[in-house]
């Protein structure tokens, strides 16, 4: 029987993030408490978002609205790396970086966890910014998925290519 396998990845669904950003922009344009604050949220390049408002608390409120919209769209908040509000002239700005991919150190942690606590006969291979897990038994792979889901990593984890 051939080996079964799946990949452990940390990817961002950019379309869902873009939809959440658009919803947030519409909400802050219509909400009364944001009138006259100059609050805005927009993309800054491919993997960064910038929030600006007239005060720190308004910028933080926009960030909270954005996080709420992301959660409703099933995007993990672990992909966000938000800075503290900083003053830039009359505006308060928050820079948000989007984290994607599993670093080699994190991949090694997951691989060690699978070797130490996972079922026997399961192999984990690091392939760039993802991890390929393979085994002869599909039940073992299900056990590995449950094991990895139990852990609380500081990055989002998805399971793809289950075969």
From Swiss-Prot:
GO cellular component: a single term: cytosol
Keywords: Nucleotide-binding
InterPro entries attached to this UniProt entry: DUF520, UPF0234-like_C, UPF0234_N, YajQ-like_sf
Single annotated GO MF: nucleotide binding
Gene3D superfamilies: 3.30.70.860, YajQ-like, domain 2
Described purpose of this protein according to its UniProt entry: Nucleotide-binding protein.
Protein known as: Nucleotide-binding protein Noca_0564
């Amino acid at each position: 029987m051939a080996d079964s396998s799946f990949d452990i990845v940390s990817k961002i669904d950019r379309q869902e993030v873009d939809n959440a950003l658009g919803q947030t922009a519409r909400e802050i344009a219509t909400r009364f408490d944001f009138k006259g604050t100059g609050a805005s949220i927009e993309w800054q390049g491919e993997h960064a978002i910038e929030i600006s408002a007239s005060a720190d608390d308004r910028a933080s409120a926009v960030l909270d609205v954005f996080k709420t919209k992301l959660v409703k769209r099933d995007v993990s908040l672990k992909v966000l790396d938000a800075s503290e509000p900083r003053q830039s002239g009359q505006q308060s700005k928050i820079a948000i970086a989007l984290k994607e991919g599993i670093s080699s150190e994190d991949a090694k942690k997951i691989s060690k966890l699978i070797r130490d606590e996972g079922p026997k006969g399961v192999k984990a291979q690091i392939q760039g910014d993802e991890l390929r897990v393979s085994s002869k038994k599909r039940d073992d792979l299900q056990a590995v998925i449950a094991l990895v889901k139990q852990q609380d990593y500081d990055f989002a984890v998805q399971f793809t290519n289950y075969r």
